[in-house]
From Swiss-Prot:
Gene3D superfamilies: Globins
Cited InterPro entries: Globin, Globin-like_sf, Globin/Proto
Organism name: Glycera dibranchiata
GO molecular function, one term: oxygen carrier activity
Domain Globin, first and last residues per copy: 1-45
Misc note: The sequence of this fragment differs from the corresponding region of the major monomeric component at 9 of the 42 known positions.
Keywords, sorted A to Z: Heme, Iron, Metal-binding, Oxygen transport, Transport
Subunit field text: Monomer.
Protein name: Globin, minor monomeric component
Protein family according to the UniProt entry: Belongs to the globin family.
Length: 45
């Protein structure tokens, strides 16, 4: 599992990705790549 600090970092990254998305799908693609690269991160969402 992730530590509280790791969860905070991931949540912060997710907010950045979601904020940058603006409905264009870029954020979602980045998130999918991010989770693919680190499957354990998927548990955070």
């Amino acid at each position: 599992g992730l530590s509280a600090a790791e969860r905070q970092v991931v949540a912060s990254c997710w907010k950045d990705i979601a904020g940058a998305d603006x409905g264009a799908g870029v954020g979602k693609e980045x998130l999918i790549k991010f989770i693919s690269a680190a499957p354990e991160m998927a548990a955070v969402f």
